[in-house]
Amino acid sequence: TYTGIDGLTIGVASGTDSGGSVEVDNSTRYITYAYDAFTFGFQSNSMDSGTAGADEEYTAYAVSYAVNDDLSISYGYSELDYEGTSTLTDTTQEASAISVSYTMGSMAIAATRADVDNQDGDTVKDGEGYEINVAFTF
């Protein structure tokens, strides 16, 4: 992890899982940067499996904006690429969400709208969701 510039964080990690019958190599890279009321983030992961058609590539980014001390808005987007096999084509899961949150004293209220296409690499699994959350701190 690198944090030598104010507001900037960069990280890289990798590892190998050889506990199962097939070895899997994983790696991740990320960067976040906070400037004034904005925070930006980007992440990329890869999984390389010894099993044919099991590799995955993940990419995501997000941005948030603090309108003031109590109100913030954020947006995120991600893609997860599934490697195909000789009988299955490559597919990409896409997801996005937008959120808004407001804090007033010990109470917080947040709302999110999210969409996903090709969930788990299945081209007929699309969905959307909504959430409203109210939290109290005592």
How would you name each of these model-derived features?
Residues 1-138:
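Outer-membrane beta-barrel proteins
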